[in-house]
C-alpha cells in the first residue's frame, strides 16, 4: 500500500461520511461533496476515522489507495474549512470587480473580460487589484483560479498580468545594445 494511503483520516466534529459501494459522500457545515469509487480500494468508517484498504496487491490498487485518500482528505477539509485562492492584478489600469457569480476584468484588452463562476465557487474582490476565489471543492477553486490567470499571465519583462498572491515572477533583464 502507498504511504499516503496507509494514513487514516480523522473526521472532525460536524463532518460525517457516508460510504456506499459506488461512492463516498462527505457532509459538513459548508456543504457536501461526493466522490465515485472503483473496486480497487475499500473504505471503512471506524467511529469517525476513515481507513483505506486495497482490494488486491496490484500496482494500480496501491496507486489508487493514495490517490483516493488524498481526494477524500481534500473533501473533508473542504466541507469543514473550505478552500481559497488569492490572485493579484499587476499593471496600469488592470481592474477586477465581482458582480454576483460573474467576475469582470479589465486587463488591457479592447473589451472587458467577463468570467462566469461555476456552481459552488464564490468570488470576492476586496480591492480592485485583488481577487479571492472561495469554495468547498479544491479542484474547482484551483481550476477557476488557473482560468482567470490564463487571461493575462505575468509577462517576464515587467511582471504585468494576473498572478497568484504567493507566486514569484522572475523578471528578465532587457536586451542591451
Curated annotation (Swiss-Prot):
One of its GO terms (molecular function) is structural constituent of ribosome. InterPro entries: Ribosomal_uL6-like, Ribosomal_uL6-like_a/b-dom_sf, Ribosomal_uL6_a/b-dom, Ribosomal_uL6_bac-type, Ribosomal_uL6_CS. One of its GO terms (cellular component) is cytosolic large ribosomal subunit. Keywords: Ribonucleoprotein, Ribosomal protein, RNA-binding, rRNA-binding. One of its GO terms (biological process) is cytoplasmic translation. Disulfide bonds: none annotated. PROSITE patterns: RIBOSOMAL_L6_1. Pfam families: Ribosomal_L6 (PF00347). Part of the 50S ribosomal subunit. Belongs to the universal ribosomal protein uL6 family. This protein binds to the 23S rRNA, and is important in its secondary structure. It is located near the subunit interface in the base of the L7/L12 stalk, and near the tRNA binding site of the peptidyltransferase center. This is Large ribosomal subunit protein uL6.
Amino acid at each position: 500500500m502507498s504511504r499516503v494511503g496507509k494514513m487514516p483520516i480523522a473526521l472532525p466534529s460536524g463532518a460525517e461520511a457516508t460510504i456506499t459501494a459506488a461512492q463516498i459522500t462527505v457532509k459538513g457545515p459548508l456543504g457536501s461533496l461526493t466522490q465515485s469509487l472503483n473496486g480497487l480500494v475499500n473504505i471503512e468508517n471506524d467511529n469517525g476515522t476513515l481507513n483505506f484498504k486495497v482490494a488486491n496487491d496490484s500496482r494500480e490498487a496501491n496507486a489508487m489507495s493514495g490517490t483516493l485518500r488524498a481526494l477524500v482528505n481534500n473533501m473533508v477539509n473542504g466541507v469543514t474549512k473550505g478552500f481559497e485562492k488569492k490572485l493579484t492584478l499587476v499593471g496600469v489600469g488592470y481592474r477586477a470587480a465581482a458582480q454576483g457569480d460573474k467576475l469582470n476584468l479589465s486587463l488591457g484588452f479592447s473589451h472587458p473580460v467577463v468570467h462566469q463562476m461555476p456552481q459552488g465557487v464564490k468570488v470576492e474582490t476586496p480591492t480592485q487589484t485583488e481577487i479571492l476565489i472561495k469554495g468547498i471543492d479544491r479542484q474547482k477553486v484551483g481550476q477557476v483560479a488557473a482560468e482567470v490567470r490564463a487571461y493575462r499571465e505575468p509577462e517576464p519583462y515587467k511582471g504585468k498580468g494576473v498572478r497568484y498572491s504567493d507566486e514569484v515572477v522572475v523578471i528578465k533583464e532587457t536586451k542591451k545594445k
